[in-house]
Amino acid sequence: MFLPTDAATQYYPYFEFYGQALKSGESFLWNPHLFSGFPSYLSQSAGFLDPVNIALFSALDSFFAYHTRLALDLFLVMFFSYLAARALGLSRLAGMTVGPAYILAFNWGYLSNPVIVNSMFLMPLLVWGAAKIGEGSHRWRFASIAGAGVGWSMLSGYAQITVYAAVLFGLYMVADQLLLRREYAWRAFLKTAATLLLTGAIGVVVALPQVLPAL
């Protein structure tokens, strides 16, 4: 986006190494330019194992691929914010303002930080998913979509944002059952628990390339 310190001194060099490794067919699992060598992909390096990043940085110049990914992330924020707003009953016009408001609520310096921006889509995605699940239709489909979003954020984004968004998703599901739908039967609790377990399981499976090496 712009040129703050984090991008200029950390992420541009990270992704220049990453892009060059992909284009030359060499391994990006060991970065010889950090210390005496360091497995950058294990840190919060914004998704060296993310298939979207692999495709972008294999095909494009590293600088252009970096900013293309940021633009894609911000588009997804706008898209899922609109869907979430509509699912919550807002008008089309009001829904179109939610994404920009959400983005502007962040420190603008973060908008060039891929670790942060790669996870910004998750909150509106999970709000949309929870709202659609609460409607009672296609519960398992939207739980699966939510799980895929959690996994993608774990794979390429900021762990703190991912955890916060996932916790909010769980609280929303429980509050929707108890306070809005007022369902207190044990079957309702089992259904909510199964929904959350499915979401979590899919998230872990999607994120396995990042999770397993870090264990």
Place the predicted regions along the sequence by residue:
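Aromatic-residue-lined binding/catalytic grooves and analogous aromatic/hydrophobic interfacial grooves
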Residues: 188
